[in-house]
Amino acid sequence: MVVALIVTLAVLAWAIIAPDNLAETGTNLQSWVVVNFGWLFTSIMLACLIFLLAIAILPTGKIRLGADDSAPDFSRASWISMLFAAGLGIALVFYGPMEPLTHFLTPPPYETVEAATQDAVVPAIVQGMLHQATLPWTVYALVGGSLAYAAYRRGRLPLISSLFEPVVTNANNRIAGKIIDVFAVLVTLFGTATSLGIGALQIRTGTSIVTGRPLEGNGIIVVIISVLTVLFIISAMTGIQKGIRMMSNLNLGLVIGLAGFVLITGPTLYLLDLVPASIMQFFDRFIDMMSIAPSQGPVEEEFALAWTILFWAWWISWSPFVGMFIAKISRGRTIREYVAVILLVPTSLTTVWFVIFGGTAAKSELDGNPIPIEGSGENVMFDLLGYLPLSGFTNIVVLITIVIFFNTAADSATNVMGSMSQSGRPVPSTPMVIIWGSALGAISLFLLLAGGEDTLSGLQSIMVSASLPFTIILIGIMYCWAKDLARDPVILRQNFATAAIDQGVRRGLDEHNGNFIFGADPVPQSQGAGAEFEKDDPNLSEWYTEVASEEYLSEQAKERDKQEKERETFKESLDADGHAQPVSEADESAPPEQTDTPEKN
């Protein structure tokens, strides 16, 4: 924790003393990373998707994130609402109308449609779906699932470094492991602080629109961040069970209600037509959208730098924070349920949200009601609602939604940083929550006071660049988790059953020419189907390799005659109830003593 705090203070001092230098350095570094490693970011996003689908479809999908009999900690509705709030949050309100509108006015390079026409509507929505829907959740699900598995099923510390235990013993106590954990804390801190700073700007814009008064200057920013910091620290101190769950459930209701209102009062039939069209075009254009690369030309480079590769890097940089939070709330789920829900439910909700708000924004432009994209675009949502009925009320709902998203993101980040700073402690101590919550609020505030949006953008660029080494960590996480899953008791039991049945079939064919049935006759312990199955044996996978091999079966065949005789002797020694009768070592030939139990008629 000390190292993380020192780095935090150093970066904060940099932002205060030389904000322009921070912004310039971040922009240059981000450009270099995107141009030279854009291919890696795209490849990692696809690899994560394929990996998750594989472990969900294969027998590993039956494995539970916890003990075999563990039950989920939260209802499915609460679980989904917390996933939604942590994984998207402010970005949903911000990018929902703004990104599709931007692509509608300026189509992506691979599109041949004319800008600001009906033909440009669906491609614009689909591009936003690519950036915000399924693929971001693949990275979150990978980190969260591997952490939940390691912590709740393997009993390891819930730290990023602990994920490498399958290949490096005691990884979290090694220098490399500690560096990874400190890096995860810093990425969480600065990444969240940057987003919260942008959220504070949105709240200022919304407050100005709701009150009808222009709110400029640093004073309002100080008030907004100070009040919200106190609120999310109090919420974080109540823990996930109360604070985050309550706010997430409330916000999910507000989001659904707001989307339903816009759908009903907006161009309803137009939006309903866009839903299937957008889904079909998403799959049709998926390869084209994923294939865009900086090396294809200056236009493609500019687009990748501003959108696609930027988003991949940004989601990867957020994965330690969001993944660890998802792990905290996902105990008791099977891997199949975990992957299915995380990939399908947020994707579906995000798709509907982008269709409703992006489609309404585009239709507004087509109908001659322009929506200017001012500054970073925090005005778009409010301007869009201004063309619909009850805009005064809906603006207040949006403002409340942003405030709650602000709090849930900061609350979740504070809990995660506190946990990581205390060696994975499930519930961080109150002082630790206060320390990291205060640091998060202070950094958001001072970055805005020092250089405004430019400083925030510069820090965001640095955090995006910091995601480059984490792409390598993601590759390691996939390898280590796959290795763990291959040695999971569920898989080994299945492998053992397969081997045992295989041996039985071979023997039945050899000895009885196929005229046999499987049974469960009692045999000496040394000859049982699980005779060599040692659940505590660290080389259990090697055991399975041996037991399923031809060589092993051949060796067993040589002893069949001896074993058959032992089985017959054992059966003869059973009493009427099928239990083995104790035999005295002093006189093995002595018959068992008579008991007072009456004979059966």
Language-model region placement:
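Inter-helical loop and helix-membrane interface segments of multi-pass membrane transporters/permeases
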Residues: 19-35, 59-75, 95-183, 197-223, ...
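Alpha-helical transmembrane segments and their helix-start/interface "positive-inside/aromatic belt" motifs
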Residues: 1-5, 37-43, 71-92, 137-138, ...
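N-terminal alpha-helical transmembrane segments of multi-pass membrane transport
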Residues: 1-118, 480, 484-485, 550, ...
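Long, low-complexity, intrinsically disordered cytosolic termini of multi-pass membrane proteins
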Residues: 496-601
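Membrane-embedded translocation segments of transport machinery
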Residues: 172, 179, 184-333, 340, ...
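Helix-loop-helix module between adjacent transmembrane segments
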Residues: 2, 6-16, 49-54, 88-92, ...
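Hydrophobic alpha-helical segments of multi-pass membrane transport proteins
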Residues: 7, 40-57, 255-266, 349-359, ...
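Transmembrane alpha-helical segments of multi-pass small-molecule transport proteins
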Residues: 3-17, 42-50, 214-238, 257-258, ...
